[in-house]
Amino acid sequence: AGHKVADLAAQIAGVQGAALAEKDLALVMIGMNDILELYASYPATGRDALLAEARTRGAAFGAQVNQLALRGPAVVVLTVPDLGLTPFALAQNTSTGDATRSALISALVAAFNNRMSVALINDGRLIGLVYADIEVQNNVKFAASFGLANVVAAACRADAPLPGCTSATLVDTATASTWLWADALRLSPAGQSRLGLLA
């Protein structure tokens, strides 16, 4: 399993070399695995309880980012992309027979991101916030304007999962520059590039 908010403090503490200071830049993006963990417990755990836990984890993330920023480095934090728009989420609508699954995932992401963002120190100096969720939503809604030909399917072939996927192992018609998703959950180089422009 991938890292979650609860693992962030140890990751920061494990940074090699001198302590992070005011001449350093820390880029922080975490939360996808928290959202997936919460979603996996549905419907055994109800929607309201899951949303409450997403908010709790978002607040914890915001608090950790604040602690990092107060230690000296400039911090750029990215919200969790809207996972409700991923190929994974769209497939969940079909495989579960419940067409509201992707909307639930989007709601969990929104609850997490909203609580995280309001927890951040907002003085315009310590922390920069990149709205990855809104960027993904815009890319899906206005795909042609962003030069995207496909925003619903994964570009990587199933037999060439990340990180082994390359431009030679894409599904037919896919390109790294015109498909939004690399796999069922992760952005392609095109999607990552757009986040980089925002940061």
Report residues per predicted region:
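Structural recognition of the beta-strand scaffold that forms the well-ordered cores
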Residues: 24-30, 34-37, 69, 74-79, ...
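Solvent-exposed loop/turn segments at secondary-structure junctions
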Residues: 1-5, 31-37, 81-85, 134-137, ...
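Stable alpha-helical elements in mature extracytoplasmic
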Residues: 4, 8-12, 57-64, 105-108, ...
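Alpha/beta-hydrolase superfamily serine-hydrolase fold, recognizing
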Residues: 17-20, 107, 124, 190-193
